UniProtKB/Swiss-Prot annotation:
Its main location: membrane. Natural isoforms of apoE (E2, E3, E4) have similar affinities for LRP8. It comes from Homo sapiens. Residues 778-799 have a biased composition (Low complexity). Disulfide bonds join 47-59, 54-72, 66-81, 86-98, 93-111, 105-122, 127-141, 134-154, 148-163, 167-179, 174-192, 186-201, 206-221, 213-234, 228-245, 259-272, 267-285, 279-294, 299-311, 306-324, 318-333, 340-351, 347-360, 362-374, 380-390, 386-399, 401-414. GO terms for molecular function: amyloid-beta binding; apolipoprotein binding; calcium ion binding; calcium-dependent protein binding; cargo receptor activity; high-density lipoprotein particle binding; kinesin binding; low-density lipoprotein particle receptor activity. This is Low-density lipoprotein receptor-related protein 8. The lineage of its organism: Eukaryota, Metazoa, Chordata, Craniata, Vertebrata. Belongs to the LDLR family. The gene is LRP8. Keywords: Calcium, Cell membrane, Disulfide bond, EGF-like domain, Endocytosis, Glycoprotein, Host-virus interaction, Membrane, Metal-binding, Phosphoprotein, Receptor, Repeat, Secreted, Signal, Transmembrane, Transmembrane helix, Ubl conjugation. It is found in: Cell membrane; Secreted. It comes from the Eukaryota. Expressed mainly in brain and placenta. Also expressed in platelets and megakaryocytic cells. Not expressed in the liver.
């Protein structure tokens, strides 16, 4: 017989396969049509969303559309342009162009015809009441707050003319016209800078509980409790003298034992530096003792060794400049061929001859396109092209300022035009001082401190926060009352070792600090009432810290053996490293929220550098051993960057865009460390997501921490618990940790996933994973209600879990990597293929079963006996089934037998008797009869079959075989 017909499922599978092949072919044809290399002509050229497409398919910036210039070269950009009508806030040029009103008479021609700077236009300008006129010849206006601020903002200096420096009654006027607080007069320090505050001073009289440094030599007065405390407080170190303290030698800080580890070198001046910096050619100790008695070494592979043994960069060898002190780097240098003499070296603009070869360069505003040809560039691609905002126009660009700032018409820098005068606050070890950056007033905020290093401010509440390393405490006070010890509030006084960095989140009312002794980063409310450790792993020497509450991130520096600068969310998630190369000792960091850049100083490399908030676009602004001998703190405001220097004992400032205009603000200081700017524009207002929630504190029982705003779907905040408690299943309440019988060290990272929960309105956390940051698990007593199930990883016993760091409600939990996402991806990668394979197997089985059924044939024939003896009109058929194995062979008939015929399966085959007579195979069983009752098939089965009571009789030797 022929092959069996395919079933519906088989046909369906074939159709699906054909459809898949058809789709693949269509996709290939579409790709070929779009790719000219495959024979297609390709689609029409598409322009960017901020571009206009000309009829000739050229793309131009959209701002060039209808600007009365044929930029498309087919005039299509000027077709169908409506007649311009300038807004009331714009200035209408004589040729019909519209520009901003503030651009009129600003010294730059924005109108194509120059009508915005014409004499006829500018003579009509009248300065508003809040502005100051620069005089009848300039026709310019500047904010009235810029009057007598020490900077000439008008061309002729009219804003500074007739300014007489008048100090307040409680201030001292220095010889250089600056004002100084009276307490700084005759204090032994040259605070004026010209020595006028220390002239004609008598020896100061010390109080009853004070110690005079230098004995009767007229030294400074210090509190008696500072004497013999193993820290030098007097410049002559007389407070730690051996005869006074009853121990040999000076204080412990001058002995090598003062260094924390054996990997540090003790300078003779008392400080400790990395042992690897000993004899490295760079003087790191104040007294340069780390480079004393060093053998003459060899230079690195990228350096050239001068005749006197010093090392300079190899690229400075034969550069026609004397870099070695003895000039040996230029000895024996030969001048090669000057390629620029022939056809300008092929350069379109500037050709520079080098020692080997030449180099093509471009003038300002151009860039190299093919190493030789210069083309115009978009100046606004440079983030430092403008002070704040850069707007690119055809052939030029325009700088603008953010609200609250105005542009200086001379320097083109944005200056604060709102609020009070900005002031600079810094620590001077035993004091916190303040300098008015406009009036140059110099005052003392907090006197008689022991060893203050870190500080920060909260402008809205006029509060100041600081850390004292000697007392190991964090304090706070109102700035106008901070000089009174009774008004100084202790916020944190427990579990502090070396708090060296401090930052205030002025939006969410939190303080963050680093502790190099505990190697932790922690957070607490501004009153110190609720506290939590965010990071306790992978920290070596954390120092400076800064926060960006507008975007929910914090940044910190680590000057350990593997120095780096890192960032994470303010709730401790999404930790990542920004800088790890070419960095040695990053002491201070600061943020410019407007330009979204991070600045830091490196005391080892003597550099001041910056990056954007993502770690890119790195720039080194200043590299100097003179101005950056040992920088520590750094701050930025407007277009200036400020930093303190321990070795120079001074405060410097420079232009934050190019590193130029370096100047000294204060000098003759005593160990100046941290530095901050106090001004309302430094801390812009923003909504507190935790307080905007319907529930107080965002519904969190303990801490409500802002989450990093990575995307529009990021949660606004997450809840956190104390170090010794768990976050409950609702992601808001806190519970005590399970009981632990012994202290267990958690060697590996533990990640825990919590099911989705509904948060406060507007915040839904779909999946929260967080990691155990702690390295030790304290022994705690379980205090969880019996009805509450504390979630934990099922494969880890309670003794291996640390509640101190497993109670965050957040999206990712691995503080070192996004392990939760990795595990989820791995699980999906395993499950999905298994499901696909299972579906394919099931489909194959169904197709096979359908084919099997269809391949089992039935033979139908009429029963004439039944038809003759009944009145049924239905056709009666007898079905004798067979299988493919049996074929068309019928069993033979037998006349007699002792036992029934058995079909014995063996390995899938049917065994027959050893002597199968043909008659034995012609047997069948009628329905309803026992299988032992066999009937012999007659010679004419269609006429001699017995009559049965069913319409159809079906025998299948495969399905209903003999027993």
């Amino acid at each position: 017989m022929g092959l069996p017909e395919p079933g519906p499922l088989r046909l369906l599978a074939l159709l699906l396969l054909l459809l898949l092949l058809l789709l693949l072919q269509l996709q290939h044809l579409a790709a070929a049509a779009a790719d000219p290399l495959l024979g297609g002509q390709g689609p029409a050229k598409d322009c960017e969303k901020d571009q206009f497409q000309c009829r000739n398919e050229r793309c131009i910036p959209s701002v060039w559309r209808c600007d009365e210039d044929d930029d498309c070269l087919d005039h299509s950009d000027e077709d169908d342009c409506p007649k311009k009508t300038c807004a009331d806030s714009d200035f209408t040029c004589d040729n019909g162009h519209c520009i901003h009103e503030r651009w009129k008479c600003d010294g730059e021609e924005e109108c194509p015809d120059g009508s915005d700077e014409s004499e006829a236009t500018c003579t009509k300008q009248v300065c508003p009441a809040e502005k100051l006129s620069c005089g009848p010849t300039s026709h310019k206006c500047v904010p009235a707050s810029w009057r007598c601020d020490g900077e000439k903002d008008c061309e002729g200096g009219a804003d500074e003319a007739g300014c007489a420096t008048l100090c307040a009654p409680h201030e001292f006027q220095c010889g250089n016209r600056s004002c100084l607080a009276a307490v700084f007069v005759c204090d032994g320090d040259d605070d004026c800078g010209d020595g006028s505050d220390e002239r004609g001073c008598a020896d100061p009289a010390c109080g009853p509980r004070e110690f005079r440094c230098g004995g009767d030599g007229g030294g400074a007065c210090i509190p008696e409790r500072w004497v013999c405390d193993r820290q030098f407080d007097c410049e002559d170190r007389s407070d730690e003298a051996a005869e006074l303290c009853g121990r040999p030698g000076p204080g412990a800080t001058s002995a090598p034992a003062a260094c924390a580890t054996a990997s540090q070198f003790a300078c003779r001046s008392g400080e400790c530096v990395h042992l690897g910096w000993r004899c490295d050619g760079d003087r790191d100790c104040k007294d340069k003792s780390d480079e004393a008695d060093c053998p003459l070494g060899t230079c690195r592979g990228d350096e050239f060794q001068c005749g006197d043994g010093t090392c300079v960069l190899a690229i400075k060898h034969c550069n026609q400049e004397q870099d070695c002190p003895d000039g040996s780097d230029e000895a024996g240098c030969l001048q090669g061929l000057n390629e620029c003499l022939h056809n300008n070296g092929g350069c379109s603009h500037i050709c520079t001859d080098l020692k080997i070869g030449f180099e093509c360069t471009c003038p300002a505003g151009f860039q190299l396109l093919d190493q030789k040809t210069c083309g115009d560039i978009d100046e606004c691609k440079d983030p430092d092209a403008c002070s704040q905002i850069c707007v690119n126009y055809k052939g030029y660009f325009k700088c603008e300022c953010y609200p609250g700032y105005e542009m200086d018409l001379l320097t083109k820098n944005c200056k604060a035009a709102a609020g009070k005068s900005p002031s600079l606050i810094f620590t001077n070890r035993h004091e916190v001082r303040r300098i008015d950056l406009v009036k140059r007033n110099y005052s003392r905020l907090i006197p008689m401190l022991k060893n203050v290093v870190a500080l920060d401010v909260e402008v809205a509440t006029n509060r100041i926060y600081w850390c004292d390393l000697s007392y190991r405490k964090i304090y706070s006070a109102y700035m106008d009352k901070a000089s009174d010890p009774k008004e100084q509030e202790v916020l944190i006084d427990e579990q502090l070792h070396s708090p060296e960095g401090l930052a205030v989140d002025w939006v969410h009312k939190h303080i963050y600090w680093t502790d190099s002794g505990n190697k932790t980063i922690s957070v607490a409310t501004v009153d110190g009432g609720r506290r939590r450790t965010l990071f306790s792993r992978n920290l070596s020497e954390p120092r400076a810290i800064a926060v960006d509450p507008l975007r929910g991130f914090m940044y910190w520096s680590d000057w350990g053996d593997q120095a780096k600068i890192e960032k994470s969310g303010l709730n401790g998630v999404d930790r990542q490293t920004l800088v790890s190369d070419n960095i040695e000792w990053p002491n201070g960091i600061t943020l410019d929220l407007l330009s979204q850049r991070l600045y830091w100083v490196d005391s080892k490399l003597h550099q001041l550098s910056s990056i954007d908030f993502s770690g890119g676009n790195r720039k080194t602004l200043i590299s100097s051993t003179d101005f950056l001998s040992h920088p520590f703190g750094i701050a930025v405001f407007e277009d200036k960057v400020f930093w303190t220097d321990l070795e120079n004992e001074a405060i410097f400032s420079a232009n934050r865009l190019n590193g130029l205009e370096i100047s000294i603000l204060a000098e003759n200081l005593n160990n100046p460390h941290d530095i901050v700017i106090f001004h309302e524009l430094k801390q812009p207002r923003a909504p507190d997501a935790c307080e905007l929630s319907v529930q107080p504190n965002g519904g969190c029982e303990y801490l409500c921490l802002p989450a990093p705003q990575i995307s529009s779907h990021s949660p606004k905040y997450t809840c956190a618990c104390p170090d010794t408690m768990w976050l409950g299943p609702d992601m808001k309440r806190c519970y005590r940790a399970p009981q632990s019988t012994s202290t267990t060290t958690l060697a590996s990272t533990m990640t825990r996933t919590v099911p989705a929960t509904t948060r406060a309105p507007g915040t839904t956390v779909h999946r929260s994973t967080y990691q155990n940051h702690s390295t030790e698990t304290p022994s705690l007593t379980a205090a969880v209600p019996s009805s509450v199930s504390v979630p934990r990883a099922p494969s880890i016993s309670p003794s291996t879990l640390s509640p101190a760091t497993s109670n965050h409600s957040q999206h990712y939990a691995n503080e070192d990597s996004k392990m939760g996402s990795t595990v989820t991806a791995a699980v999906i990668g395993i499950i999905v293929p298994i499901v696909v394979i299972a579906l394919l197997c099931m489909s194959g089985y169904l197709i096979w079963r359908n084919w099997k059924r269809k391949n089992t044939k039935s033979m139908n024939f009429d029963n004439p006996v039944y038809r003759k003896t009944t009145e049924e009109e239905d056709e009666d058929e007898l079905h004798i089934g067979r299988t493919a194995q049996i074929g068309h062979v019928y069993p033979a008939a037998i006349s007699s037998f002792d036992r029934p015929l058995w079909a014995e399966p063996c390995l899938g085959e049917t065994r027959e008797p050893e002597d199968p007579a043909p008659a034995l195979k012609e047997l069948f069983v009628l329905p309803g009869e026992p299988r032992s009752q066999l009937h012999q098939l007659p010679k004419n089965p269609l006429s001699e079959l017995p009559v049965v009571k069913s319409k159809r009789v079906a025998l299948s030797l495969e399905d209903d075989g003999l027993p």
